[in-house]
Amino acid sequence: MKVTLIAILTCAAVLVLHTTAAEEFEAESQLMEVGMPDTELAAVDEERLFECSVSCEIEKEGNKDCKKKKCKGGWKCKFNMCVKV
């Protein structure tokens, strides 16, 4: 009886550890996939590019000096566009 109980508990522990390891591996493999589009980052990139170029055009139309908006977070404004530094 004790041997059966120990065998069942051992199998249950192995199953739990195997399932946890498989879930971690799946999560890591999804993060490591190359070519998988990240729509949130793409949207941020488009917003930054749009924000920099539009702000400059608006200031030119108002007969004011073109003061480029400062792009933050490793970006800089160049040719009226935010570019990654």
Swiss-Prot record:
Disulfide bonds: 52-66, 56-77, 71-82
Domain of life: Eukaryota
Expression (tissue specificity): Expressed by the venom gland.
KW Glycoprotein (keyword) present: no
Keywords associated with the record: Disulfide bond, Neurotoxin, Postsynaptic neurotoxin, Secreted, Signal, Toxin
Pfam families reported for this sequence: Toxin_20
Any one GO cellular component localisation term in the record: extracellular region
GO molecular function: toxin activity
Compartments it resides in: Secreted
Function: Neurotoxin active on both insects and mammals.
Subunit details: Monomer.
Protein name: U4-theraphotoxin-Hhn1a
Source species taxonomy: Eukaryota, Metazoa, Ecdysozoa, Arthropoda, Chelicerata
